[in-house]
Amino acid sequence: MQYFDLMKKACDSVGMEFNEDKYQKFMLYKDLLKEWNEKINLTAITEDEEIVKKHFIDCIKAFKADEFKKAKTVIDVGTGAGFPGLPIAIMREDVEVTLLDSLNKRINFLNEVVNKLALKNVETIHSRAEDGARKKELRENFDIATSRAVANMCVLSEFCIPYVKVNGNFIALKGPNITEELNDSKNAIGTLGGKLKGITEVEIEGTDLNHNLVIVDKIKSTPKTFPRKAGNVTKKPLK
């Protein structure tokens, strides 16, 4: 129970319940992450305490956005090693979480975690973001699309906003210093049917890190021309 108090403090700060069962799930997730990371590249963060702080607590802090407390369906686009989707699923067993990633090896890892943690509320999908968003069963089908992927907001918006229902939200987990990036992405967000709602700063317990939650309202349907074909989204970001 080495990290229980630290994680509970983080949960308390965003109004989320934490208990021993959730803690044990996070610890098993940590062990699987370290084990699989020796076979495939999942994370550069490999020390137990750093995983707890910079992965788990960072994702738990997403609940500072009330939207994550109310949503019934969430898709994590470009989920990688499962962040923030898996922590959201552990914290809220009543929300349906879809994890989407383009690399099959990562999907195999995620399936292992879902099975070992006995998570009944998680589905994994092997797909590129721009391909998945063109599928009828996924497009504009989620209360929230989220991503912690390392990409510019213009790019992330085109990857994520098409998945969001009208009146839902796209929420990006970003680092500090995002003012310029957001200014550059406002037109793109609007083109895709979104409108910037606000930015929520979060502190990560036990570190000097400050991160930001960028919250976008989906106010109208995304034009059928988006997302563009593979490659164009990153090569020629919307402006």
UniProtKB/Swiss-Prot annotation:
EC class of the enzyme, as a word: transferase
The UniProt record lists the keyword Cytoplasm: yes
Keyword vocabulary terms for this entry: Cytoplasm, Methyltransferase, rRNA processing, S-adenosyl-L-methionine, Transferase
GO CC term, one of those recorded: cytosol
List of residues binding S-adenosyl-L-methionine: 78, 83, 129-130, 148
Subcellular localization, as worded in the UniProt entry: Cytoplasm
Highest taxon above the source species: Bacteria
CDD domains: AdoMet_MTases (cd02440)
MF terms (GO), sorted A to Z: rRNA (guanine-N7-)-methyltransferase activity
HAMAP family: 16SrRNA_methyltr_G
Family: Belongs to the methyltransferase superfamily. RNA methyltransferase RsmG family.
Role: Specifically methylates the N7 position of a guanine in 16S rRNA.
Name of the featured protein: Ribosomal RNA small subunit methyltransferase G
Annotated organism of origin: Clostridium perfringens (strain SM101 / Type A)
Gene from which this protein is expressed: rsmG
